[in-house]
Amino acid sequence: VRALPAFTLLLASCGGGAAENEAGPARERGKPVVAPAAALSPVAAPAPTSPLGNTVGCAPDEDRIFSCKVASGKRIAICGTGERDAEYRFGGSTPELVLRGGRWASVPYSGGGEAQIVFANGTTRYIVFSRMVRTNFAAGEPNNPAISDGVIVLDGEKVIGLQLCDDADTVSIDYDLAEAHFPRADELFSWETDRADRRTR
């Protein structure tokens, strides 16, 4: 089991409501979000500014803060490009979306924790996350942690996409590198990442 610690321009369907866990406060759930097929491809995405130009991965002289492949076969990487500077990259053989800047946050949970890094593209936010939450609270039994990495996409506060890493070589968010390259926020950027738990059990 891969432990924490050491986004996929996507608009995929999202899971519906399920029981809350300690990862966040109780809140009402809406109907499952299903994005149109056309939304799965980038539209008017910013031109890549990556120093690599033709690959999504981090260069040897960059800090690999996060990296994984999603079910579509495309990759997400967050690479530290300089002091207090980093990029979010998504694409297949070449970058389709590159975003700079970002902020990060982390919280501890009983039996785990979560880190998030957020990048903005207009009103759309890409929140990369690495989380581990306890799913079994029976005395004397294993915690049965749910471990997930991925990206959740929000338009304002509306969830419009969620996709999980599908890669044995996933590099979860590195807390030390995130601290070195991003300003820290006091709270997580979204509690909706608990949707991932229902897809990994």
Residue ranges and their predicted role:
Residues V70-I78, A120-G140:
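Charged, amphipathic alpha-helical segments
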Residues C14-A18:
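Bacterial signal peptide processing site
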